């Protein structure tokens, strides 16, 4: 099957993404944007009602390679919750952030390019092309992710499910896709699982909820980070598609183990047992409000 050529919009989107993610100067500027601009609005729209457990645990890690954050996927804004947690920790190893996304919208629509630029400084990279005729582009994206994970300080935020769960039960997962397993087994990063619950898909409504007087009790966004996933036994095997799927399933299994703790925390919030002065509320962390400074080991 012949490779489908990129459209003019896709070429423009890729040039912008490479300028802000591959070029070191562009990545430096992007990081300043995320820490100085995105941080302001994400914090204003989320931090008041966001509770994070396990943050001090991941702050204590000393990665010698890149880190892959894997989480469930219910909201368009899940990755921003993880970004905010890393910046407000502050997590010292989260120096350069990358959020792989499907090419649909963000790379094939003018508005998608604008959203990626204005909201994330271009950090929604690399794009995943799912069409069969774009397989070579998809393979190149996977190779790029593997390459990124070789460098300490690089963090990839990924959803093993591949797409948002839209069912009525927020604790139910879609099947894990093998791509995330392939990237991990070839890149060999530290893999940190997280379970996130409480975000919606309407940014205006989410910000309004954050400003409400009962934001924490009625609309808490709870994130639970777990310890790094042990997958050494899988890395010892010969890479193959079945093994990629097995790795992805293991990552989602570890994410799933965090659901019970999230339910316990939510019950404590609703009952008043977990009070507003608890240090796990992000707004209670002693960090700057105007700029997210890098943490120290």
Predicted regions and their residues:
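Short, flexible active-site-adjacent loop segments at beta-strand->alpha-helix junctions, enriched
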Residues: 56, 73, 103-105, 162, ...
């Amino acid at each position: 099957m012949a490779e489908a050529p990129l459209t003019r919009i896709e070429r423009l989107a890729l040039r912008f993404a490479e300028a802000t993610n591959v070029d070191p100067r562009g990545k430096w500027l992007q990081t300043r944007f995320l820490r100085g601009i995105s941080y302001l609005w994400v914090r204003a729209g989320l931090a008041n009602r966001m509770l994070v457990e396990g943050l001090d645990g991941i702050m204590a890690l000393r990665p010698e390679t890149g880190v892959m954050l894997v989480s469930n996927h219910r909201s368009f804004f899940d990755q921003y919750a993880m970004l905010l947690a890393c910046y407000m920790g502050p997590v010292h190893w989260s120096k350069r952030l990358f959020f792989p996304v499907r090419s649909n919208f963000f790379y094939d629509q003018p508005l998608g390019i604008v959203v990626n630029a204005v909201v994330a400084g271009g950090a929604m990279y690399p794009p995943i092309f799912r069409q069969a005729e774009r397989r070579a582009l998809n393979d190149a994206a996977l190779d790029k992710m593997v390459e990124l994970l070789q460098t300490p300080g690089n963090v990839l935020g990924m959803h093993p499910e591949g797409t948002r769960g839209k069912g009525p039960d927020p604790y139910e997962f879609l099947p894990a896709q093998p791509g995330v397993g392939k990237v991990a087994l070839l890149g060999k990063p530290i893999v940190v699982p997280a379970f996130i619950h409480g975000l919606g898909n309407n940014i205006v409504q989410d910000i309004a909820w954050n400003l409400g007087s009962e934001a924490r009790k009625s609309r808490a966004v709870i994130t639970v980070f777990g310890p790094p996933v042990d997958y050494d036994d899988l890395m010892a095997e010969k890479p193959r598609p079945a093994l990629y799927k097995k790795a992805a399933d293991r990552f989602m299994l570890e994410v799933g183990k965090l659901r019970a703790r999230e339910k316990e925390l939510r019950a404590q919030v609703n009952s008043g047992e977990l009070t507003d002065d608890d240090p796990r509320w992000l707004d209670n962390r002693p960090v700057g409000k105007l700029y997210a400074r890098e943490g120290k080991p």
